[in-house]
């Protein structure tokens, strides 16, 4: 592929960087905001979770708009919400303004999480769609890691008399502006253009993206034309031909969260502070280490994604997570806290490996692949909203679970182990195999 084509996929996936950056940045900023604004525990919790409320709303709301106006215009709009939300959080004056700012930021994050998987899937050729579609999750992990580094860099440094946490939150402006500039340069999805009758521009974009023979573009256009002939029921398609896809999208996104990934991302420092008595600096460095593991393994996942069946990788990841979490649970109930600390750290890293090689990228990849063109925007939105609702549930109840189990991390991680075990059977019996198939082939399989 030409370098400018990689530029398209890089900027197309940049919403994931902002998604991950916001996820990671609040873990370092929230204790500082709590202290600065003298917030109650409940208010601090709401500041953290407000973005999840906005994200669920943004994910659900953007789908119908994307199917009507296109992916590109909505990505540009999401970048403007990112810019506005970043500025609002950096200049918040108290609980109320911070909560509103976080909801605005959530609208942007949720919109990007629904738009990007569908957009990348519609741009990528079938044989590279796994790797290119996985760039969204790679960007999420890169954003999380950059946020951890930003937290460490700004912590305790009140440049120009401005509090450190304001610099942390304001630093999101850099990728937000990049997304806006990139959005202006990105092409519209060729499949969206074709579906709207603009076959000339669809062919032009495809020819540029493929940079191959005209025959391969013609074959792809012919497949689009075949799908375009199929009867379309509008939103009714969600409850008829797309119903299996809706079940898979909701299930895979709920399970991606219920295996506990964001308990690690949001609360890992608190796990080691409350559960093992680590000081704050060491706990944050552990988070950085886990962030590096997450990022590096996701790079590996993008490299191998088109070499293995999606279901094979998902099952492998489920087994690794189940075993790591089960051992972690037993360990923390059978040995002393001092003895369990280092093995727990290693088992969490193993669990992250299992997630990052499979469920991290593939869940987002699938929601961009499995829906028919007529409802791909709204279908991707439903899957993304399910992810945010699951995220909200995990983030709200993790610390409660930790307290219920008397700060023994084996308790909540044991619950996550059960969901990881359930995910094995969900993949086996419900998830379709999409590797190597064109989006049109996947849609025709749904219609059979």
Name what the model sees in each region.
Residues 1-201, 207, 228-448:
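Alpha-helical transmembrane bundle of multi-pass membrane proteins
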Residues 217-228:
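TPR/TPR-like alpha-solenoid helical repeat scaffolds
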Residues 208-219:
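Short intracellular "coupling" helices and adjacent cytoplasmic loop segments at the cytosolic face
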């Amino acid at each position: 592929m030409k370098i400018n084509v990689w530029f398209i996929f890089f900027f197309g996936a940049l919403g994931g960087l902002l998604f991950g950056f916001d996820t990671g940045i609040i873990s370092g900023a929230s204790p500082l905001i709590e202290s600065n604004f003298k917030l109650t525990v409940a208010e601090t919790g709401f500041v953290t979770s407000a973005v999840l409320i906005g994200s669920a709303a943004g994910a659900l709301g953007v789908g119908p708009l994307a199917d009507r106006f296109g992916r590109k215009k909505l990505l540009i709009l999401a970048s403007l919400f990112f810019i506005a939300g970043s500025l609002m959080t950096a200049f918040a004056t108290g609980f109320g303004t911070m909560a509103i700012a976080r909801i605005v930021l959530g609208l942007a994050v949720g919109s990007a999480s629904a738009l990007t998987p569908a957009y990348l899937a519609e741009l990528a050729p079938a044989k590279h769609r796994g790797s290119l579609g996985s760039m969204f999750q790679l960007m999420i992990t890169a954003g999380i890691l950059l946020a951890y580094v930003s937290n460490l860099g700004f912590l305790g440094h009140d440049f120009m008399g401005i509090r450190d946490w304001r610099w942390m939150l304001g630093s999101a402006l850099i990728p937000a502006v990049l997304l806006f500039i990139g959005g202006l340069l990105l092409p519209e999805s060729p499949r969206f253009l074709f579906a709207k009758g603009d076959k000339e521009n669809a062919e032009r974009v495809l020819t540029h993206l493929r940079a191959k023979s005209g025959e391969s573009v013609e074959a792809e256009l012919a497949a689009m034309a075949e799908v375009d002939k199929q009867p379309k029921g509008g939103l009714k398609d969600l409850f008829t031909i797309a119903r299996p896809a809706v079940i898979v999208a909701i299930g895979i996104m709920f399970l991606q969260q219920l295996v506990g990934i964001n308990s690690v991302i949001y609360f890992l420092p608190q796990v080691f502070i409350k559960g093992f008595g680590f000081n704050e600096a060491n706990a944050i460095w552990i988070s950085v280490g886990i962030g590096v593991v997450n990022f590096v393994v996701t790079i590996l996942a993008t490299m191998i994604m088109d070499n293995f069946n999606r279901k094979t990788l998902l099952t492998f990841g489920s087994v690794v997570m189940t075993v790591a979490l089960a051992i972690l649970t037993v360990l923390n109930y059978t040995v002393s806290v001092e003895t369990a600390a280092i093995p727990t750290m290693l088992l969490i890293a193993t669990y992250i490996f299992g997630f990052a090689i499979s469920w991290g990228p593939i869940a987002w990849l699938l929601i961009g692949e499995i829906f028919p063109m007529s409802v791909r925007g709204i279908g991707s939105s439903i899957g993304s909203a399910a992810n945010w609702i699951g995220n909200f549930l995990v983030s709200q109840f993790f610390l409660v679970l930790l307290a219920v189990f008397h700060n023994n991390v084996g308790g909540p991680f044991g619950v996550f182990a059960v969901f990881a075990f359930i995910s094995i059977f969900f993949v086996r019996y419900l998830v379709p195999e999409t590797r190597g198939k064109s989006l049109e082939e996947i849609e025709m399989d749904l219609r059979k």
